[in-house]
Amino acid sequence: MTAVDFSAAMLERARAKPGAKAVTFVQHDAAKPFPLESAAFDRVFCCLVLDHISELDTFFRELRRLCRPTGCVVVSVMHPAMSLRGVQARFIDPGTGRRISPAGHAHQMSDYLMAAVRAGLKLERVSEHAADAALVARSSRAEKYLGWPMLLLMKLVPGGPGDYSPA
């Protein structure tokens, strides 16, 4: 298992988790080609990153390059509808305690889907997840988003008309 993150502090938090000894951690800017071998992974997970990537075509080609032909790519991203509410990703840096609002890029759902297709990935499943009463019960701050889609999930598999060709 390999985990990649831009933030050294986030990687340090991950290294402290149970089972971390079995994980290879790589600090890397996801806007650049990954320093990993082609077709090295059965499953490629991309979690809450896409809204920080300006060039989706290049990024999805990289996800496709890393995935074995029989594997899958699973993507989670803040739902594009959240940008209509003025919501941008933000977090507290565990190393400094400072509030961080990384640069974001407003993409539409079709931007994500078409970049994946152009990269040679086929959509196998897509789901949208809205704030509900259970979420509000866990976090009262979510009440203002009740009923709004907050998360977009996609399962993609290699194949399709994309222009991907392994190097």
Go through each PLM region and give its residues.
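Class I SAM-dependent methyltransferase SAM/SAH-binding core
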Residues: 1-33
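Hydrophobic residues in well-ordered beta-strands that form the structural core
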Residues: 3, 75-77, 125
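A short acidic, Gly/Pro-enriched loop at the edge of an enzyme's catalytic core
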Residues: 34-44
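A short SAM/SAH-binding and catalytic strip from SAM-dependent methyltransferases
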Residues: 42-56
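A short glycine-rich, Lys/Arg-flanked "PGG" loop and its adjoining helix->strand segment in the class I
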Residues: 57-72
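Conserved class I S-adenosyl-L-methionine
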Residues: 72-103
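Short alpha-helix
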Residues: 104-127
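Core SAM-dependent methyltransferase catalytic element
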Residues: 139-167
